[in-house]
Regions:
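AMP-binding/adenylate-forming
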Residues: 41-55, 66-125
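Beta-strand-connecting loops/turns
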Residues: 64-65, 222
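Conserved AMP-binding/adenylate-forming
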Residues: 149, 154-222
Length: 222
């Protein structure tokens, strides 16, 4: 895909619709190489938000929640598009973004936020800022009941989950599993299991293809 975009900028030679059908542009993070441009049609946006909303709902987000979204809004799908998946649950979404951690702590206190959407490493940053800038305040005092995590590894460690429950008093969930150039969020955990539920079966059909023959191969566990 990267080679196709380099040869046929900016979207490659594999777009499934005319350029004028695209209404939103995102880019991948580029952490493993050249960032890729992602073009979404209005229908792409709607389907992506619906599937991601299922994931957030399965992880426990409800219309009664106020959730602060603390991922990067600068072109990455984790920002605006994940924001819209949170909103699809009926929850009130606070579009905070990254940085300004002191302001985030005050915002959580003042607005009555009940859930946070962020990377698994961000609670440690919050803990440090609370300890340094808010004497007498503990993470539990913020009243967050639910942590919706994605964008990084680490949440599969049972000890880390246990620590989040103990220090924050919130339930940690892997709520945001996806691949930007397919769906930004198509799998999530629920309250009963730490494994991921696949939430896009009606719109995304996974296949394993032999690159030489183009023939489908059987999917096996292992």
């Amino acid at each position: 895909l990267r080679l196709a975009q380099a040869a046929h900028p900016p979207f490659g030679n594999y777009m499934a619709a005319e350029r004028r059908a695209a209404v939103r542009l995102h880019r991948t993070s580029g952490t493993t190489g050249q960032a890729m441009n992602l073009a979404l049609s209005a229908r792409d946006c709607a389907v992506t938000e619906a599937v991601g909303g299922r994931c957030q709902s399965a992880s426990g987000l409800t219309p009664e929640d106020t959730v602060v979204h603390c991922l990067n809004y600068q072109m990455w799908m984790g920002g605006l598009t994940d924001h819209m998946t949170l909103q699809a649950t009926g929850a009130m979404v606070v579009p905070f973004g990254v940085g300004s951690t002191e302001l985030l702590v005050r915002t959580i206190q003042e607005v009555g936020i009940t859930a946070i959407s962020c990377t698994p490493s961000y609670p440690a940053v919050l803990e440090r800022v609370i300890a340094e800038k808010f004497p007498g305040l503990t993470p539990r005092d913020l009243g967050l009941r639910l942590g919706l995590f994605g964008g990084e590894a680490g949440l599969d460690d049972p000890a880390y989950r246990a620590r989040l429950r103990e220090v924050w008093g919130m339930e940690p969930r892997n709520a945001n599993y996806g691949v930007s150039d397919v769906f930004c969020n198509f799998a999530a955990q629920c309250e009963h299991d730490t494994r991921l539920h696949y939430m896009a079966a009606d719109v995304l059909w996974p296949e394993l293809i032999d690159p030489d023959t183009g023939a489908p191969l059987p999917l096996v566990v292992g």
